[in-house]
């Protein structure tokens, strides 16, 4: 049997098996673990009472986090004319139309979010095989296809959690970074959970928010008391 590393031993010592944590306790534990060699994100997983095999129970959305994510987000925008100028003023890193599409087809994908004005979708649609697998395809359901490209840029830059329920009925999102204090994480988590509740499918029955888990990139997953997150 392989020996545990110092980090693994520290994690084992800090985590109580089968414990359900308050949000503050979970943040404290994750922040107290030995640091990795890079800035770890704090991630949330929420088990939902949905059946993702049914098209009307696929929960998908984007939540602007009040305390941000701590990450620098590069944004590309497909727009022209006044909308292109507005996107630039809002802080977009790359703005273009046909020229941006050609750049992407050439392999330039140095951005984290793609936003498109509605009239640009005829151009963006041709990039589905490139953007789709990378989770970059603009979609009106998450606010990345919109006439208000400037507003979408500001939201993306300020820090957004984008999510789509997986086959197991779970959504995953970055909610901050290791080092964020508990108050900031609580702001972000409560905002996300409130948005998830607004997205509850009408056909979903029984308990909707079934389980919440908080983890760091290289750390353990800690179960958080659902009732400790405000309704």
Curated annotation (Swiss-Prot):
Please name the CDD domains in this protein's record.
Answer: Ribosomal_L1
Entry GO terms, CC: cytosolic large ribosomal subunit
| Annotated Pfam families | Ribosomal_L1
Q: What does this protein do?
A: Binds directly to 23S rRNA. The L1 stalk is quite mobile in the ribosome, and is involved in E site tRNA release. Protein L1 is also a translational repressor protein, it controls the translation of the L11 operon by binding to its mRNA.
Keywords linked to the UniProt accession: Repressor, Ribonucleoprotein, Ribosomal protein, RNA-binding, rRNA-binding, Translation regulation, tRNA-binding
Q: What is one GO biological process annotated to this record?
A: regulation of translation
Subunit structure of this entry?
Part of the 50S ribosomal subunit.
- Transmembrane segments in this chain: where? none
The name under which this protein is listed is: Large ribosomal subunit protein uL1
UniProt record similarity statement: Belongs to the universal ribosomal protein uL1 family.
Output the superkingdom of the source species: Bacteria
